[in-house]
Design a protein with these regions (language model features):
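Generic low-polarity alpha-helical segments
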Residues: 8-12, 76, 116
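Periplasmic-binding protein-like
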Residues: 102-107
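N-terminal post-signal-peptidase region of extra-cytosolic proteins
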Residues: 91, 127-133
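N-terminal secretory signal peptides
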Residues: 1-26
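A generic structural motif
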Residues: 77-82
């Protein structure tokens, strides 16, 4: 990777961080302003409106943005509060399957959503699970898979090509998500693209794992590993500078599907919030940290 490419990526990362801060601050400012301006009228109307606590299960990479958007939404809809459950999409899928209360599920990969959707291919939904309201399902966001290294790294890992060479030489420690985590599944595709044997590398002590993307990000940030593969949104939130971005040929598109569950305790309110997540106001927050609309 040449100096121009690195400089451009650093600029984009800095711009992304600035955009994220601006978006989250703007949303918070809007929330405070809205809460103040409607205080008297909201008090009267909220007495008549039934209080709702929406239970949202969402991929860990959505932590910062959904918390901010939730505050904005509550400012405009005082009767609605949120209980967020952020974790790996695989863990969330299992919790839903085991009967956990959930109104809205936002996954970082299609696989975990498909495994709960009776209308999905039987090759994926092998157990015939029927938890998702298929009519409510949308492809909400797109993310990017990026390669990050600790600040000040001198390993020369400045691209996926360079990462592959170091992994072949087995002279670094690399962190990736578990196989049941979407970011781990995308990373597996990248390893396969470079014809690298994950099992052999793990046995040689070259690969370490995180149970979700936040754990991978933390290991890179703390310098516990020489490199890690995360989403660009998590890199921005952690202040990491991505050194390379995976292409579609390497791992495909990173699409976040969202759907209301059939057994949702607050199905109608969940559908209204899902509609809100697709508005320009919400998308401004998502785009501020590197997401894009599908």
């Amino acid at each position: 990777m040449n100096d121009h490419r690195i400089s451009r990526r650093r600029f984009l990362a800095a711009a992304g961080m600035a955009g994220a801060a601006a978006a989250l601050t703007a949303c918070g400012g809007a929330a405070s302003s809205a809460a103040s301006s409607v205080a008297s009228s909201a008090a009267a109307s909220s007495e008549a409106a039934q209080s709702v606590e929406l239970i949202v299960f969402a991929a860990a990479s959505l932590t910062e943005t959904l918390n901010a958007i939730g505050e904005c939404y509550t400012a405009d809809h005082p009767e609605v509060t949120f209980r967020f459950n952020f974790d790996s999409s695989g863990t969330l899928k299992t919790q839903i399957q085991e009967g956990a209360d959930c109104d809205l599920f936002i996954s970082a990969g299609q696989k975990q959503m498909n495994q709960l959707d009776i209308t999905a291919s039987a090759d994926v939904n092998k157990d015939g699970l029927d938890f998702v309201d298929a009519d409510s399902r949308v492809n909400l966001l797109e993310n990017k898979v990026v390669l990050c290294v600790p600040e000040g790294s001198d390993k020369g890992i400045d691209s996926f090509d360079a990462l592959a060479e170091h992994l072949k030489a087995q002279d670094i420690l690399f962190c990736m998500g578990n196989s049941d985590v979407p970011v781990g599944q995308y990373t597996q595709k990248i390893l396969a693209y470079y014809q690298l044997d994950e099992a052999a590398l793990a046995a040689a002590g070259v690969i370490t794992y995180g149970s979700n993307v936040k754990e991978v990000t933390t290991q890179v940030t703390e310098g516990s590993v020489d490199a890690g593969v995360v989403y660009c949104t998590d890199a921005y939130s952690a202040g990491l500078t991505p050194v390379d971005e995976a292409t579609k040929e390497m791992c495909g598109q990173v699409i976040y599907p969202a759907a209301v569950l059939k057994a949702a305790p607050n199905a109608e309110a969940a559908k209204e919030f899902l509609t809100y997540l697709q508005t320009d106001k919400a998308m401004t927050v998502f785009e501020g940290v590197g997401f894009s609309a599908v």
